[in-house]
Amino acid sequence: LLASSAASDVYKRQLEERTPKKVLVLDLDNTLWGGLAGETDHTPVLLSEDHSGLAYKNLQRVIKLMQEQGVLLAIASKNNEEDAMEILEHHPHMLLGPEDFAARRINWDPKPDNIRKMAEELNLGTDSFVFFDDSEAEREMVRQMLPEVTVPDFPARPEELAPCMAKIYEEYFARAVITKEDREKTAQYRANAGRNAMAEQAVSFEDYVKKLEICLIPVDP
């Protein structure tokens, strides 16, 4: 028991001394689910409670827990956005919905470019990002073009996905203390990104305030 307590204290000190990563960037096809979006309708992709789809659902369970511990989730997927969103919004076994992601880039642009844009949107450095993708070519491109981004290896078998993600959490994201603010980070960053987007579109300060639906009350001098 004493040895276990001492080991726990050492681990806690290690967590306190390091700077945890903040954003987990996820691919979709053959990563968050098995198969390819858009090939048929939204049900045949591998994501279920049976053997063929359970590995991907277990992965989503781990990622959902990470999000609840304050990890920001983002999507970088080469896909038709409509097909991908159909699965995210309507697949009966999806545990992660659009509202769980602080930023999304579902298009055909290079993934390093999309990661840069999401970093700007979230106002975070790319050195706080971890990129998880089944494609070796995509992983290598991010390593070459964004060497500050952490790019773990992808497991060889689907059943290794959930244990691999749990290890990624412990190695890069785990914190000594999780606060209420940490647990609400996704909503906070989504709101900030929305305000920033409105600010860019506004032609004047008054227009920006109007878009935010804020009432300004004059104060007498």
Where are these regions (language model features)?
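Single conserved hydrophobic/aromatic residue that forms the stacking wall/gate
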Residues: 1-7, 11
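Basic, amphipathic N-terminal segments
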Residues: 19, 43-47, 68-69
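Asp-based phosphoryl-transfer active-site loop
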Residues: 22-36
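Active-site neighborhood of HAD-like aspartate-dependent phosphohydrolases
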Residues: 32-60
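Extended, hydrophobic alpha-helical segments in both membrane/secreted and soluble proteins
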Residues: 32-33, 55-62, 73-84, 111-118, ...
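Metal-dependent catalytic core segments for phosphate chemistry
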Residues: 34-44, 78-95, 100
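Substrate-recognition element of Asp-dependent hydrolases with the DxDx(T/V) motif
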Residues: 54, 58-92, 104-105, 142, ...
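C-terminal cap/substrate-recognition subdomain and adjoining C-terminal extension
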Residues: 89-221
